[in-house]
């Protein structure tokens, strides 16, 4: 808890058994709620999460990264979180930054905080492939122009949100795939939320989840499409539910089936 606000960490996960425990062990004591949503993994991610004392939800099918986030945010809001921090279970980002990111939200200055791999040159130092770094810089410059803000990157998966933002954004209008992250930032800009950044080191290694070249290209086209719809909606050329107040929201209309696993009687000794 920070400034009287309850902090939740949500972890969208798929086949994260090898890295999950390291991720959970680094979570700070300021975290009041720990939630993992397993997107129908083929390994023991869900069982290990339960053993570690994390509230665990399991999808009945592999719905994708974006849909996984929708479940994460619904369950965090239902649990009474005031601030929600998304941490990937693959240990690519350090959970040690959770208190700093949550504090930036708790101060009332920001509604969304992004952990940037670009600030401080953490991306290349951590092993980001050169083609991904190039795409990151090109797409970021493109979106800074058309979204009218200046961020160091739009593509990090480590981020924090206020409750108000998660309740107001029409997240159910977004993709079930990786471009969900980018769509969420564009929505936050459209709705007038304040976005801050913090420098974050990153690690690229075998067990860390990462999309391949083909999926990266698909993601890039998704970013361009999202930006085009943002501009068209803002100029009133089209009306996009993803950028309108009447769009579907996770707190009101979420529908994906996710089974919650019961926790062990004593998670420390399970």
What would you call each of these model-derived segments?
Residues 38-46:
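A conserved acidic beta->alpha catalytic loop
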Residues 12-29:
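Short, well-formed alpha-helical segments that are part of the catalytic scaffolds
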């Amino acid at each position: 808890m920070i400034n009287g606000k309850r902090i939740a960490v949500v972890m969208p996960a798929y086949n994260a058994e090898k890295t999950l425990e390291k991720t959970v062990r680094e979570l700070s004591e300021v975290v009041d709620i720990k939630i993992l949503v397993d997107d129908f993994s083929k390994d023991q991610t869900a069982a290990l999460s339960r053993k570690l004392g994390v509230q665990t939800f399991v999808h009945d099918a592999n719905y994708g990264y974006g849909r996984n986030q929708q479940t994460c945010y619904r369950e965090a809001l239902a649990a009474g979180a005031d601030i929600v921090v998304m941490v990937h279970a693959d240990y690519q980002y350090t959970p040690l930054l959770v208190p700093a990111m949550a504090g930036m939200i708790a101060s009332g200055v920001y509604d969304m905080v992004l952990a940037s791999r670009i600030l401080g040159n953490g991306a290349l130092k951590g092993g980001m492939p050169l083609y991904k770094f190039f795409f990151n810089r090109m797409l970021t410059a493109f979106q800074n122009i058309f979204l009218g803000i200046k961020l160091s990157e739009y593509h990090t998966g480590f981020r924090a949100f206020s409750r108000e933002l998660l309740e107001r954004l029409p997240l159910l209008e977004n993709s079930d795939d990786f471009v969900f992250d980018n769509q969420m930032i564009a929505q936050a800009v459209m709705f007038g939320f304040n976005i801050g950044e913090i420098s974050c080191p990153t690690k690229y290694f075998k067990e860390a989840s990462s999309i391949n070249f083909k999926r990266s290209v698909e993601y890039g086209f998704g970013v361009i499409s999202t930006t085009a719809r943002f501009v068209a909606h803002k100029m009133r050329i089209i009306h996009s539910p993803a950028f309108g107040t009447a769009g579907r929201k996770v707190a009101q209309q979420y529908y994906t089936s996710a089974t919650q696993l019961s926790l062990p009687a004593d998670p420390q000794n399970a």
